[in-house]
């Protein structure tokens, strides 16, 4: 029952990768504004526009400075989610006149430390700012973890919160999951040992019931907490 609208542009998005191109700022500025421009054409006015990371961070800024009082756009709320604060969409100030096209009154909202900072613009203008967990929301208020945005985040901390990612409990149900070796339930989880043994075999590990098997789904980057794993690794291996 959910309708999806897909926004495409061959010039900006028909590429081998998602980002990492010389014109990323222009590409995502286009996308962020096109999301708002398309609203009158799809016969649907959203209550909330949810934006994720710097690539869509201009949408709250565009909305508040250029669209909020226009007919058909009134009372839309914006939510901005920070997945990784290290990547903020930082570019030279010439982008304001050459690409962004925002009103002069809004330029201070996106300027930061002599540059243009997409993420700062979203933090300033979104109705709410969220992160992927309560602990991450707390961490990025600290200069050590904020990559320079702690001042603005502390000033806007009243609208900052962390929401843990959920899972689809039907899809990831061990009683019916087709992607595990043996199904089991909370009432009979002894078969879980069969999955451990099969995974050990698949990964060419010794098949030992007395050795814990620990997995971590993560990219190998610092903010994923690999330093915490390393700190306790000797204790794990030492038994």
Residue ranges and their predicted role:
Residues 1-239:
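Catalytic cores of nucleotide-sugar-dependent glycosyltransferases that transfer UDP/GDP/TDP-activated
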